[in-house]
Amino acid sequence: MIDFKKEVIDRSFEMPIVVDFWAPWCGPCRILGPVIEQIATEQEGQWALVKLNTEEQEEISYQYGIRSIPNVKMFYRGEVIDEFTGALPRQMILEWLKKGLPKPGLIALDQLLAEHANPEATAVESLLERYPDSPEIRIVLSQLILWDQPAKVIEILEPVKMGTPYYDKASHLREIASFLCMSVDDAEIMEIQDLIKGGHLHEVLPKIITTLGKNPKVADGQLAKAAIGIFQTLGTQHELTKAYRKQLDMVLWA
């Protein structure tokens, strides 16, 4: 028997874990087993294989809804992120792994964030140099340097194109950065820019709402886009979103 929490759940925070749910009496399991074991050996270091005998660990099998075997589930950061049932041929398993495995850049980023909840921007920049194709790293780095280096944020996020999973997040960050990069001679807008750059969101959000209440299209509409971007970036559960988002919607859409 395996220690499921230790060997699967806990370890999945370090790397993806693929669990093969099988039983000795299962013919298709005997077909799948050697194939997936060989692939695990070939791809050692990218993910780890754990074999779970459903006859020995019925409670775990029930917990994960195993009704037909062989069943293969991919765990990452404690959650099932993909699965298949049946004795798939080698090529289909390889395609499943290619599609479902978290990219190396995301794994490296998750490891960094697990060690440092608030990492230095330089550490994330180093990751981006190693994994330039990782949109997740681009998003996190942009969030870290947004107030100080908005022009660089626009550059960093340029490769995140429409139709990709992180496009919406990138767009909101770009809207904020674009507003901060604007050259204006309006003292009120300049003050708002300075407050945002200083990270004084508690102070600036009421000012933004007041300014937009007078003219929703001020600063060529960029202030409104930046305000929406700030709330989207903070998330719906953030205290500032709860306090001010409805007020923003009222001045923009009333």
Predicted regions span which residues?
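Non-catalytic, surface beta->alpha helical segment in thiol-disulfide oxidoreductase systems
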Residues: 67-108
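Short pre-active-site segment immediately N-terminal to redox-active cysteine/selenocysteine motifs
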Residues: 15, 22-25, 68
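Structural microenvironment flanking redox-active thiols in thiol-disulfide oxidoreductases
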Residues: 54-60
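The canonical Cys-X-X-Cys-His
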Residues: 26-29, 72
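Non-globular targeting/processing and membrane-anchoring segments
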Residues: 86, 98-254
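A short beta-strand-turn-helix
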Residues: 1-17
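Typically the conserved alpha-helix immediately C-terminal to a functionally engaged Cys/Sec
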Residues: 28-44, 52
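Hydrophobic beta-strand anchors of alpha/beta hydrolase catalytic cores
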Residues: 18-19, 49, 72
